[in-house]
């Protein structure tokens, strides 16, 4: 995401 959290590639907020 645009925020600095670790998330899967498909979660683009």
From Swiss-Prot:
Predominant subcellular localization, coarse grouping: secreted
Keyword Aminoacyl-tRNA synthetase: no
Coiled coil regions in record: none
Cellular localisation: Secreted
GO terms of biological process kind: neuropeptide signaling pathway
Keywords from the named record: Amidation, Neuropeptide, Secreted
Keyword presence, Secreted: yes
Domain of life assignment: Eukaryota
Chain positions found as Phenylalanine amide: 13
One Gene Ontology cellular component: extracellular region
Family from the record: Belongs to the FARP (FMRFamide related peptide) family.
Protein name: FMRFamide-like neuropeptide AF11
